[in-house]
Design a protein with these regions (language model features):
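Cell-wall polysaccharide-cleaving catalytic domain and substrate-binding groove, primarily
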Residues: 1-169
Length: 169
């Protein structure tokens, strides 16, 4: 029998997911009860989530976040940051942050900020933020600052979120 080979996309996901997990403590690996129910059925409870295995956790994040988010189409040096953004925010918000970061790299905005990851986004990211990942980190921190302005009760998470954003990738 031929030796089984690991899917290159899955291998790339594992590398980026490991970077995210190393950067921040997430007991359930970013898996939410909603994600668990979508994959395993509506009868899943918080207790099931608390007892999630590392393999199940990885499979869910790969199938529910990595693949539908088309994260592998983005420049390699921003994939871990973008994966983490998708775990913290809704996917559309993560894409908006990415789009604003791309636009911040030049005087003329080059992409629409609409939360839709179109084909041109990866190319635009390659020409801009892949050259300076700090643009994406800064845009993420700006998002958190604006969130605190809108919702002062979020202030308690500021240091944790800011540290998370700047220390990854």
């Amino acid at each position: 029998a031929a030796p089984s080979s690991v899917n290159p996309d899955r291998k790339n996901f594992e590398k980026n997911y490991d970077a995210v997990l190393k950067n921040v403590s997430m007991p359930t690996g970013g898996v939410t009860l909603q994600m668990l129910r979508a994959v395993k059925g509506g009868n899943q409870t918080q207790d099931h989530l608390n007892k999630i295995t590392k393999k199940t956790m990885r499979d869910i994040v790969y199938d529910s976040v990595w693949k539908p988010g088309n994260i592998s189409t983005l420049p390699e040096n921003i994939q871990a940051q973008f994966l983490d953004m998708n775990l913290v925010h809704e996917s559309k918000e993560a894409v908006r942050i990415l789009q604003r970061a791309i636009n911040s790299a030049s005087e003329m905005p080059s992409v629409s900020v609409d939360g839709i990851l179109r084909k041109g986004i990866s190319s635009a990211a390659n020409k801009t933020i892949s050259k300076d990942v700090n643009l994406l980190k800064a845009e993420r921190c700006l998002y958190y600052a604006e969130e605190i302005r809108r919702k002062p009760n979020q202030k308690q998470f500021w240091v944790q979120r800011f540290t998370r954003a700047i220390s990854l990738g």
